[in-house]
Amino acid sequence: MRKRADCAGTLQVNGPGQIVGAPLAIRIGDNAHFGSGFYIDARGGVEIGENCHISRNFVCYSVNHDYEGEALPYDDQLVQKQVVIGINVWIGMSVCIVPGVTIGEGAVVGMGSVVTKDVPPLAVVGGNPARVLKFRTKEHYERLIREGKYGGVSGRLVLKPGRNDVG
């Protein structure tokens, strides 16, 4: 029997990938896009906001082995920590996210990054471990939200109702 993730609307998946722990442990917002080769272990809970675009070879874990457990190198217990990816996030190719991380609204995660700590809203991060390189322009970001302009799963512009509750 195939399990399905809880998806709020349009979802495009470009090639094979795997979600472990679906359907109850993962929620995916509208207008989401996954590149091929993704692996998401959602047993600790994963939330992916609307308008998130995630490139190829994405790896996300919300569980880890208990290396402080009753066996070496680890026992059979899993430590679960939810991963939250906010709305309007762009994640580049070959990014890895560890358990317990929150990626803030509008953030950009550069190709090959290993995200080990929370990412602030509108931050552009990169590296191993990922660090803040700069921030998106808040005024520009808020204008696009007010105008309801979003990139669709095909890369084309998608117009949605604008929001006036920003800025």
Predicted regions and their residues:
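Short beta-to-alpha loop/turn elements within the nucleotide-binding domains of ABC transporters
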Residues: 101, 112-113, 119, 128
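Flexible, glycine/small-residue-enriched loop-and-beta-strand segment within the central core
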Residues: 15-28, 33-101, 136-137, 142
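Terminal amphipathic alpha-helical/low-complexity segments used for targeting or macromolecular assembly
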Residues: 1-4, 8-10, 51, 65-70, ...
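Conserved catalytic segment of ABC-fold P-loop ATPases
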Residues: 104-107, 120-122
